[in-house]
Amino acid sequence: MSSPLDLYECVTAQGETVRSIKAKKGSKEEVDAAVQVLLQMKLDYKRVTGQDYKAGCPPQDGVTPQDGAAPQDGEDQVDPWSVSSSSAKGVDYEKLIVRFGSSKVDQELVDRISRLTGKTPHRFLRRGIFFSHRDMHQILDAFEQQKPFYLYTGRGPSSQAIHVGHLIPFIFTKWLQDVFDVPLVIQLTDDEKYLWKDLTLEECRRFTVENARDIIACGFDVNKTFIFSDLEYMGASPAFYRNVVKVQKHVTFNQVKGIFGFTDSDCIGKISFPAIQAAPSFSNSFPQIFGDRKDVQCLIPCAIDQDPYFRMTRDVAPRIGYLKPALLHSTFFPALQGAQTKMSASDANSTIFLTDTPKQIKNKVNKHAFSGGKDTIEEHRKLGGDPDVDVSFMYLTFFLEDDEQLEKIRQDYSSGAMLTGELKKSLIDTLQPIIAEHQEKRKHVTDDIVQQFMTPRKLHFSC
């Protein structure tokens, strides 16, 4: 394995290569290929050092890996801190289901959700974006028997602006809340970001409030939704902290090292944090909502990179007298430069932020969205494009509601009838109004509204 310093120097050199190609006005394909190599190098650097690459800041001596054992040769890297794939199509989710031991969201499950709710399945279910689950049938059994359950999802507030990829779990959770008419708790893990990132507590608090505004702008029902900051709620809720301590007592250091790859040089806050992310899975962590009830099951919609936290939670739950939480896992929202990694707020060029203007959205898509098209118009007309690696088409699968229109775009692009520029225009025309609408809704989220959502209180739900 290369040393951290060797990797740092390789990333630096590749960055110079990218800049040189751009300065010489190299072809788009040449630039994209060089950028892909750079992104992969940065991922390798982070996997080995546990740090994001920063120009002019070589790694310190003694840096050790923080994300556990590397995947087997040819396997995708998927954990709570990094996601990468060597395939232009992105992560192989069928293999990931086998590797993680979860169950596929099949048509039978989608049909059952539709039948019980009386609603058309969300496009994320229809298109396999939420592709994996744990015990979702138990949640549907409870719903069928008119027993209550609740939703739990979260966000790590590491920056003031969130990007379109962050919207995915909240869009789907909002739909679940609406069709099942159930309460929802949203954990903002500001403590986690303080422990993992170079941030002050004050910055974490500010990011928490700003991220809460974006979440509220998704349209959640204030009467059924409680948003909480770990740094605030932990000190205000003895019941929540008791559950944290129960989990801490029943999970060994050796277990969390095996699950999360912690090392002897990690601060003790990191080692104990998984118990804090586990605690919202238990209904009596929220006595203001559920009283002391332990029998209200939890459903967690999340990206599959969060699954290690909840595998641990599901393992410990029966040993401390609680129900195992159920999960629905989503695929990753790819970076603009390609599906080999997920969108990240740390790279402005790979990211479309919810604060971007229509012009910025257009420029980012046109300049940076990886294309599955051919090198020339003539070749593209003859051979067609590849929607399976084309980022613009991937984004449309997330945001374009009309299934027939999406399929027509797929066919036209694959046949060569639609050019890359036309496909990108379809994406731009889809994204711009969605982000503009979100920005308008966010303007109306006042400090008082944020306070309402973040105040511990009774929520309305059917027992």
Curated annotation (Swiss-Prot):
* Listed GO MF terms: ATP binding; tryptophan-tRNA ligase activity
- Is Nucleotide-binding set as a keyword in this record? yes
Per the UniProt entry, what are the Gene Ontology biological process annotations, in alphabetical order? tryptophanyl-tRNA aminoacylation
InterPro entries, per the entry: aa-tRNA-synth_I_CS (IPR001412), aa-tRNA-synth_Ic (IPR002305), Rossmann-like_a/b/a_fold (IPR014729), Trp-tRNA-ligase (IPR002306), uS15_NS1_RNA-bd_sf (IPR009068), WHEP-TRS_dom (IPR000738)
Report residue spans for region: Disordered. 54-86
Looking up CDD domains in the UniProt record yields:
TrpRS_core, WEPRS_RNA
* Pfam families the record matches: tRNA-synt_1b (PF00579), WHEP-TRS (PF00458)
Top-level taxon in the UniProt lineage = Eukaryota
From the record, which residues define motif 'KMSKS' region? 342-346
- The record places the motif ('HIGH' region) at 157-166
Family matches, as NCBIfam families: trpS (TIGR00233)
This protein's name: Tryptophan--tRNA ligase, cytoplasmic
The protein's organism comes out as Danio rerio (Zebrafish)
